[in-house]
């Protein structure tokens, strides 16, 4: 299979390129500055030149708080940009796997299934949902939406590394971590084979997140336990950490599609990540 990865230099994209190569697939990557997904003509030309069998669309505006102030710009990238990739994929006759987020849900009534009602509570979620809908509108016969959550991996800034950095600071005896948000920590390493599997499934919406769920505080405690970090984790509230963008309380993604890939328990994936980083 020849794959095109748009956004291949990011945390997920780097792992996906490695995974595709390891599985014997031909993989081509495009990212800024060589592609601007908001430029439709350029996207169509670049995808056509790559002549892929499948397009993995990972490029996105991912600054959740920044999107509150710059929703128009975020919408241009996450909405129109995704539409452009869908149009280009359609014209190239390639399957499209577009990565989306748990933030398309309001976070008040999870866990959420693939067909649960969407109702994002922040600009970032609204722009990602717009991208989902525009891709399905332009290319219903070829678009697969893969929603994921709470990503961490070797090739980018992430919660696990940040917290271990804080926890190993000799001047600290504790860290305060939010305990009233619940989600599914997802390893980029585990997500990659799931995305490849989704490319072979019928068009539609798929949930691809770590098995089980926890709070940010629970996630941090397990990371500290595995990494043998001697630092107390104290529960705190979302309210105590005021941020521009509201966060969902419960954004647990449930897999109900029979043929959909199921990721292993988040604790097992985290154990591997901690082992590899030490």
Residue ranges of each PLM-predicted region?
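N-terminal Rossmann NAD(P)H-binding glycine-rich loop of SDR-like oxidoreductase domains
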Residues: 3-21
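SDR active-site strand-loop-helix element
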Residues: 6, 30, 55-59, 96-101, ...
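Adenosine-cofactor binding site in Rossmann-like domains, unifying the SAM/SAH pocket
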Residues: 21-45
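NAD(P)H-binding glycine-rich loop region in Rossmannoid oxidoreductase-like domains
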Residues: 40-77, 88-90
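Catalytic helix-loop patch of NAD(P)-dependent Rossmann-fold dehydrogenases
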Residues: 76-84, 104-146, 150-151
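NAD(P)-dependent short-chain dehydrogenase/reductase
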Residues: 133-183, 188-190
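Mid/C-terminal beta-alpha module of Rossmann-like enzyme folds, strongest
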Residues: 192-195, 200-244, 274-277
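C-terminal amphipathic/interface module of NAD(P)-dependent oxidoreductases
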Residues: 231, 246-278
């Amino acid at each position: 299979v020849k794959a095109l990865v748009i956004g291949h230099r990011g945390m997920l994209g780097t792992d996906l390129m490695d995974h595709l190569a390891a599985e014997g697939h031909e993989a081509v990557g495009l990212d800024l500055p060589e592609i601007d997904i908001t430029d439709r003509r350029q996207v169509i030309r670049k995808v056509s030149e790559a002549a892929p069998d499948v397009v993995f669309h990972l490029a996105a505006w991912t600054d959740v708080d920044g999107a509150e102030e710059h929703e128009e710009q975020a919408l241009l990238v996450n909405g129109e940009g995704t539409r452009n990739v869908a149009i280009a994929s359609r014209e190239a006759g390639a399957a499209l796997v577009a990565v989306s987020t748990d933030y398309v849900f309001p976070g008040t009534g999870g866990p959420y299934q693939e067909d649960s009602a969407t109702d994002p509570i922040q600009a970032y979620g609204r722009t990602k949902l717009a991208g989902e809908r525009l891709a399905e509108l332009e290319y219903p016969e070829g678009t697969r939406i893969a929603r994921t959550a709470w990503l961490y991996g070797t090739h980018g800034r992430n919660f696990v590394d940040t917290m271990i950095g804080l926890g190993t600071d000799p001047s600290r005896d504790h860290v305060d971590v939010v305990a009233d948000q619940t989600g599914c920590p997802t390893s980029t390493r585990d997500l990659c084979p799931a995305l490849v599997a989704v490319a072979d499934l019928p068009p539609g919406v798929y949930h691809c997140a770590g098995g089980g769920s926890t709070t940010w505080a629970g996630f941090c405690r397990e990371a500290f336990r595995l990494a043998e970090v001697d630092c107390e984790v104290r529960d705190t509230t979302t309210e105590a950490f005021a941020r521009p963008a509201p966060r969902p309380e419960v954004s647990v993604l449930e897999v109900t599609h029979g043929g959909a890939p199921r990721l292993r328990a988040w604790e097992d994936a985290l154990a591997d990540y901690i082992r590899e980083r030490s």
